[in-house]
């Protein structure tokens, strides 16, 4: 249907709508995660996300459209799962650091005596560097990095639901994971860390 030649100012008289009214009031919605906007006749409606923190367990979408929390038991299960995911994320970061330390560039210095001028003996030092881009440690680090990035974005999206229970699960899981896994870690700041 071509709407290019239509006069939209005359439409409001026939459709009962006044588009020039500045005092439009919308009826309050009952749940902060779902608010249907006006439909354009195609049956599709837009879901509004909350912009403030709320504590509820009904109709909470968790990452995927088919994963909806509607009961206190489902929220408790989601809390535990998100808590464990955040803990796993912290453990994965520490594990990657340990693997990186073990597989870092191995530099060996070999000293050999060589004859010098006037019959003196000099020590010549050779440096051998061993690290390749297509090595197993580097490929493993790459796969683990991809997993870490995906998990970090999942945790960010979970936090962005603004559901208080799920936000607490992310923060508590990350804190517990850090407490459990990084107590032996040297104080190093990772500037490439995602979502913190």
Swiss-Prot record:
The chain crosses the membrane at residues 75-95, 139-159, 163-183. Residues 1-74, 160-162 are extracellular. The keyword Ion transport applies. Expressed in the tubules in the inner cortex and inner medulla of the kidney, the villi of the small intestine, the choroid plexus of the brain, the stroma of the ovary, the seminiferous tubules of the testes, and the sclera of the eye. Expressed in intestinal epithelial cells, with an increase expression from the crypt to the tip of the villus. Mainly expressed in both proximal and distal tubular cells in kidneys. The modification Cysteine sulfenic acid (-SOH) is found at residue 195. Disruption phenotype: Homozygous mice lacking Slc31a1 exhibit profound growth and developmental defects and die in utero in mid-gestation. Homozygous embryos exhibit a dramatic reduction in size at E7.5, which is exacerbated during the progression of in utero development through day E10.5. Although the fundamental mouse embryonic structures are conserved at E7.5, homozygous embryos show that many structures including the neural ectoderm and mesoderm cell layers are poorly developed. GO terms for cellular component: apical plasma membrane; basolateral plasma membrane; early endosome membrane; intercalated disc; late endosome; late endosome membrane; plasma membrane; recycling endosome. O-Glycosylation at Thr-34 protects from proteolytic cleavage in the N-terminal extracellular domain. Proteolytic cleavage, leading to a truncated form, is facilitated by SLC31A2 and initiated preferentially by CTSL and to a minor extend by CTSB in endolysosomal compartments. A post-CTSL/cathepsin L processing occurs to yield to the fully truncated form. Residues 96-138, 184-196 are cytoplasmic. The record marks 48-49 as: Cleavage. Glycans are attached at residues 23, 34. It is a multi-pass membrane protein. One of its GO terms (molecular function) is copper ion binding. Its main location: membrane. A motif (Bis-His motif) lies at residues 13-14. Residues 19-41 are annotated as: Disordered. The modification Phosphothreonine is found at residue 120. Keywords: Cell membrane, Copper, Copper transport, Disulfide bond, Endosome, Glycoprotein, Ion transport, Membrane, Oxidation, Phosphoprotein, Transmembrane, Transmembrane helix, Transport. GO terms for biological process: angiogenesis; copper ion import; copper ion transport; establishment of localization in cell; intracellular copper ion homeostasis; plasma membrane copper ion transport; protein complex oligomerization; silver ion transmembrane transport. It catalyses: Cu(+)(out) = Cu(+)(in); Ag(+)(out) = Ag(+)(in). It is found in: Cell membrane; Early endosome membrane; Recycling endosome membrane; Apical cell membrane. Homotrimer; is stabilized by cisplatin via interactions between cisplatin and the Met motif, and could be crucial for the copper(2+) reduction process and copper(1+) stabilization. Heterotrimer between SLC31A1, CCS and SOD1; this heterotrimer is copper(1+)-mediated and its maintenance is regulated through SOD1 activation. Interacts with KDR; this interaction is induced upon VEGFA stimulation leading to SLC31A1 and KDR subsequent co-internalization to early endosomes, thereby activating KDR downstream signaling in endothelial cells. Belongs to the copper transporter (Ctr) (TC 1.A.56) family. SLC31A subfamily. The C-terminal domain mediates copper(1+) binding and is involved in the copper(1+)-dependent-ATOX1 interaction. The C-terminal domain appears to act to limit transport through the pore by regulating the rate of exit of copper ions at the intracellular side. The N-terminal domain can collect copper(2+) from copper(2+) carriers in blood. The N-terminal domain, in the trimeric arrangement, tunes its reactivity with copper, promoting copper(2+) reduction and copper(1+) stabilization. The bis-His motif directly coordinate to copper(2+). This is High affinity copper uptake protein 1. The gene is Slc31a1.
């Amino acid at each position: 249907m071509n709407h290019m030649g239509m006069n939209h100012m005359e439409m409001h008289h026939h459709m009962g709508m006044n588009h020039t009214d500045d005092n439009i009031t919308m009826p309050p919605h009952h749940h902060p995660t779902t608010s249907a906007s006006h439909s354009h006749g195609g049956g599709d409606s837009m879901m509004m996300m909350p912009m403030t923190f709320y504590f509820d367990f009904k109709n909470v979408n968790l990452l995927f459209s088919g994963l909806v929390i509607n009961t206190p038991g489902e929220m408790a299960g989601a809390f535990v799962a998100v808590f464990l995911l955040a803990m796993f994320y912290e453990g994965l970061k520490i594990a990657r650091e340990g693997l990186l330390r073990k597989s870092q560039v191995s530099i060996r210095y070999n000293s050999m005596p060589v004859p010098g001028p006037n019959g003196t003996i000099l020590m010549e030092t050779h440096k051998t560097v061993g690290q390749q881009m297509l090595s197993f440690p580097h490929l493993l680090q790459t796969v683990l990095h991809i997993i870490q990035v995906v998990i970090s974005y999942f945790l960010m999206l979970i936090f962005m639901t603004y559901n208080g229970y799920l936000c607490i699960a992310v923060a508590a899981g990350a804190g517990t994971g850090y407490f459990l896994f990084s107590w032996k870690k040297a104080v190093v700041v990772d500037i490439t860390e995602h979502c913190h």
